[in-house]
């Protein structure tokens, strides 16, 4: 890996992690087009750290409030709306953890292909379009009950299928349940904190036991680039969806999916 490759891959990860357009669909492009080798475990950990830093710092006030409310609910019986939201995020994280433990090997062997990614990019893009056009967008994230949390959590679990997009699946599920676009995005981003933390920790443990060499320069490039690009992406996405909705991302997904199919069939 070169510094240029590290920069491009981290930039792609940061820009696509929180947009409903599938990071996996984009990350296969450099290797498919330019023949770049796999970036390795250490770099995967680095970009997870970068994107996690971005969402935690962007939502730092909400994160601090939710943590305080969560502990207050445990030790003091706090039943505030913040405590409820914190517990709903915990509940929504469980399906992905269970699904990941049970299906990780199946996904790696049978579903991590360019054709699957192209298909899911198109299918889930159309689903996002239909839900965005037909759902009643009235609720905010504080109106999330445990049934809604489980439903959105299942969507997050299904997003382990490459090409689906974690943010795309969770935002689609939240919109279907009546969340406003802004509330759906905020809940999706807050949900990402525990799942990115767990995924990064898992990769970190694999890295420690693998004995893979670590290039500090590449890691710092990955962390810094993914952090900056993800932070900017979160900010502008939240500003954009209130005015334009999800249609631009649907159109982009369709173009990307069709483009992937065209590339694969011509190769």
From Swiss-Prot:
Stated EC number for the protein is: 3.6.1.27
This protein's record includes keyword Transmembrane helix: yes
Entry protein name: Undecaprenyl-diphosphatase
GO aspect biological process, one term = response to antibiotic
Give the protein's function: Catalyzes the dephosphorylation of undecaprenyl diphosphate (UPP). Confers resistance to bacitracin.
Q: Which residues cross the membrane?
A: 1-21, 39-59, 83-103, 111-131, 144-164, 189-209, 218-238, 245-265
User: Where is the protein localized?
Assistant: Cell inner membrane
Stated membrane topology is: Multi-pass membrane protein
Q: Name one Pfam family in it.
A: BacA
Q: What are the UniProt keywords, alphabetically? A: Antibiotic resistance, Cell inner membrane, Cell membrane, Cell shape, Cell wall biogenesis/degradation, Hydrolase, Membrane, Peptidoglycan synthesis, Transmembrane, Transmembrane helix
What would be an example GO MF term here? undecaprenyl-diphosphatase activity
Q: Which PANTHER family match?
A: UNDECAPRENYL-DIPHOSPHATASE
GO CC annotation terms, alphabetical: plasma membrane
Q: Top-level EC class, please?
A: hydrolase
Record's miscellaneous remark: Bacitracin is thought to be involved in the inhibition of peptidoglycan synthesis by sequestering undecaprenyl diphosphate, thereby reducing the pool of lipid carrier available.
- Family that this chain belongs to: Belongs to the UppP family.
Q: Which organism is it from?
A: Vibrio parahaemolyticus serotype O3:K6 (strain RIMD 2210633)
The record's gene field reads uppP
Q: Which reaction does it catalyse?
A: di-trans,octa-cis-undecaprenyl diphosphate + H2O = di-trans,octa-cis-undecaprenyl phosphate + phosphate + H(+)
